[in-house]
Amino acid sequence: MRFRAELEPLSPYNPPRASQEAAAERGTGGLVKLTSNELSFGPLPEAEAALAEALPRANRYPDRYAAALREAVAAANPGSDVANVLVGNGSSEVLQNLLMLVERPGEVLFPWPTFTLYPSIAGTLGLRARRVPLTEEHRVKPEALLSAVTGETRAVILCNPNNPTGTHLTLEEVSALADALPEDVLLILDEAYQEFVADPAYHGSHALALERPNVAVARTFSKAHGLAGFRVGYGLASREIADYAERVRFPFSVNLAAQVAATASMQAREKIRARAEFVIRERERVERAFREAGLNYVHSQGNFVLVETSPALFERAGVLVREGDPLGYPGWSRVTIGNTQENDLVIGALG
């Protein structure tokens, strides 16, 4: 068989130290898992009840359109309706479907370091991945992104807040970036961590996506909603973009369990907000501990903190964190903000 040449440099998305992570997930191996930016709480009671009610219907295919989920998303984002909503098997599928819409050949720009899946998605679709370095302060520089745009640029992906740094751009900065981009370049805002942003100048991008013909937002239920195991995400965009994204979406990609759990969770927005506020308070506590210990860290707006120290420091205290090496930060650790007891272990590791 002859394989596509552009697949040669790609490798499967595989978290490092997978065997240790699996042991931590099972509660064996004596380790607490704070590697993957997951929520330490399970689904909301409303989501659990919806799952129990839906279980007898598991012999039937789910709603292909995920209408109830789209309605819940639209209701949570003023100014949008179901025709503006994208759904997918995690926000990763939403991102992939958006990139499937652009012309090829061409290139995709994104800041770097950022979410490591972007180069793989671009490569599988036959698009070249171009990395634009972050500043020395670990921030995205919009001017650098704009300077990197060429006639071959088809899309720009902005992880905001950025993973693994937790730094962010304000709505004003994002709007200015969208204004300056050529109209035929798609700006994708990956907002997986948007619920954890404390800066009021950040919020409101969904309106930007509804107003602009070349802007789309991708979000997930894997973080603040605590539904990572169900693989469900959503997006917001113009009716035209949403229509084309639905044309390329794999049928039934959002299963029954994911649909009902995500719908119930989205409808309980006040409880999700309370969870996010807890994470923000705990993040501030962990950052304060890093500061008092004299460690260099990046002030974060996500549910994680990037700190300049070896993962071994935390592992000795029974905490498994993400190694910075594969994330573009050798010698650093990315620490997920967990529950109070888990964060106590992180702080206790500092001595």
Curated annotation (Swiss-Prot):
GO MF assignments: histidinol-phosphate transaminase activity; pyridoxal phosphate binding
Enzyme Commission designation: 2.6.1.9
Catalyzed reactions: L-histidinol phosphate + 2-oxoglutarate = 3-(imidazol-4-yl)-2-oxopropyl phosphate + L-glutamate
Protein's GO biological process: L-histidine biosynthetic process
SUPFAM superfamilies: PLP-dependent transferases
Region named Disordered: 1-26
N6-(pyridoxal phosphate)lysine modifications at: K223
Pathway(s) where this gene product acts: Amino-acid biosynthesis; L-histidine biosynthesis; L-histidine from 5-phospho-alpha-D-ribose 1-diphosphate: step 7/9
Origin: domain of life: Bacteria
Entry keywords, A to Z: Amino-acid biosynthesis, Aminotransferase, Histidine biosynthesis, Pyridoxal phosphate, Transferase
Cofactor(s) this protein requires: pyridoxal 5'-phosphate
UniProt keyword Transferase, yes or no: yes
Quaternary organization: Homodimer.
Family the UniProt entry places it in: Belongs to the class-II pyridoxal-phosphate-dependent aminotransferase family. Histidinol-phosphate aminotransferase subfamily.
Name of the protein: Histidinol-phosphate aminotransferase
Recorded name of the encoding gene: hisC
